[in-house]
Amino acid sequence: MRRLIEHSEKAAPRRLKSARRIHYRHGLGTAEAVSLHDGVSTRQVVKWLVTATLAAIVGLTACRQLPDIDPSYHEFAYVSNGKSDSVSVIDTLALRNVKTINVGKNPTGLAVNPARNEIYVANTESNNVSIISTEKNEVAATIGVHRAPYFVSVSSDGKRAYVANSGSWNVSVIDLDKRAVIATIPVGNAPGLAKVSPDDSVVAVSNRGGNTVSLIDTHKLAVRDTLPVCSQPQDLVILPDSSKVYVACPGNNQLASIDLKTDRVVALLDIGKLPIQMALKPDGGEIFVSNFDGNTFSVVEAYTNEVSSSYLIGRNPVRGLVTSDNSLLYVSNFGSDNVSVYAIDEGRVIGSVGVGSRPDGLALTPNEDHLLVVDTKSGDVAVIRTTKTRDNSKISAERALVTMIPVGNQPNDIVIKAFRSGGK
C-alpha cells in the first residue's frame, strides 16, 4: 500500500513549495490510470452506507426546483457502463434513471455533438462507435473503427468526430452527416486520446507508447508533425484560442506545452506525482492538474508556462471540472470517496462532499445548480446540490448530497445534453 499524505480537509491546504520529480513506477494506459487501488476499509464502507441511506431518503422526494419548463425542453445525462455494455440515461430535471441503452462492448469515452441531438460512445472492446439519438434515447447507428478506441472528440460545427485507436496506432475520422469513416490516419505508438482544437484546424494525438504527440491537419486529413514530448503522454487540453496544447505525462511527472503556430515544444514543466487528468478554466488562463499518486493538484499558468502552486487535496484525485464563471474547481478523489471544492480566486479548498465508492467522471447541469459524480465501484451517480454566494468578494459554497442514482456496472464517463424536441 502506498504511503498516503495525511491531512485535514477542513483546514486550509498546505501550499507546496515545489513539485518533486519522481520516477513513474507503473506501466499504465489511458483507461487503466484510475484503477490502481482496490478495496476499501470497513470504516469507509460504513460511512458510505450511512451516506447512501440518508441520500436515498432524501431522494424519495428529490427533484430540481425549477420554474415552469417548456415541455419541449429536455435535459439528460448519459453514463457509460463499462462492464454492462450499456449507457444509462438520467433525466436531470427529475433526477432519476429513465432508460438503459445497450451499446457495444466495454463503452468508455462519451462525447456530445454541439450542433445536433446526438451522443457518441467509444466501445473499446467491440472496436466501434455508437451514435445515440438524444430525442429517442436509442442507438441510431453503429460505426466500425479500428482497435481499442477509448475517446471521441467532436468538431465545434458538429460535422466530424475523431477517434484514436489505441490498438492499431491510427485515428479514424467520421463524417457525422454520412455516418461513415472518411479517413484513417496513421499516428504514433498506442494513441490514447485525439482532441480537436476549438477552431477545428488541428487534432492533437497523445501517443502513449511512443512518447510523442502527433498533430493532424484537419483540412488535409494528414499528420503535419510528430513531436517528442515527455514519458507516456496521456491527457490533452487545448487553449480556447487554439494557440497551445498541453499534454500530461505520468511517465515522468511532467507537462509539455506545444505552440500550435510553430509546432514546437516550448516548455517541459515538472509537476506532481502521476499527473493523469487536466481541467482548463473556460477563460484559458489556468490549468488544474490532478496528481493521482501525490494526492495533490497543481495550478499551471497557461499563457506563461509556469507552475504557480500545488495543493494537498483528497486521496488520488482524478477528474477536475471548472464552473463557467471561472470561480470554482470541483475535483473527484478516487481514493477518499469524496469531491473537493476549490475557490480559484481565493486559492483555497473550501470544502468536500462525500459520495459513493471510487468517484471519477464529473458533469454540471446546464444552469450549474447540480453536480453529477460517477462512482465507478458502487455503480451509481451522486447528485450534489451546488449554490454560490458572494460576500465581500469571498466565495462561500453550500453543498448537499441530494440523492444517489443507480446506474450500470463499472460506470466511468458522463456527459449532459440539453435540447428542445425537434431542434438543437
Predicted feature residues:
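Short, low-complexity intrinsically disordered segments enriched in A/P/G/S/L with frequent Arg
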Residues: R2, R15-I22, A31-L36, S41
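A cross-kingdom feature strongest in bacterial/archaeal respiratory oxidoreductases
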Residues: A11
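Intrinsic-disorder-associated, low-complexity terminal segments enriched in Asp/Asn/His/Tyr and depleted
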Residues: H7, H23-Y24
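Bacterial N-terminal signal peptides
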Residues: W48-G59
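Residue-identity detector for glycine
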Residues: G27-G29, G39, G59
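N-terminal acidic, proline/glycine-rich, low-complexity intrinsically disordered segments
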Residues: M1-H7
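Predominantly soluble domains enriched in secretory-pathway, periplasmic, or organellar proteins
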Residues: V58-K424
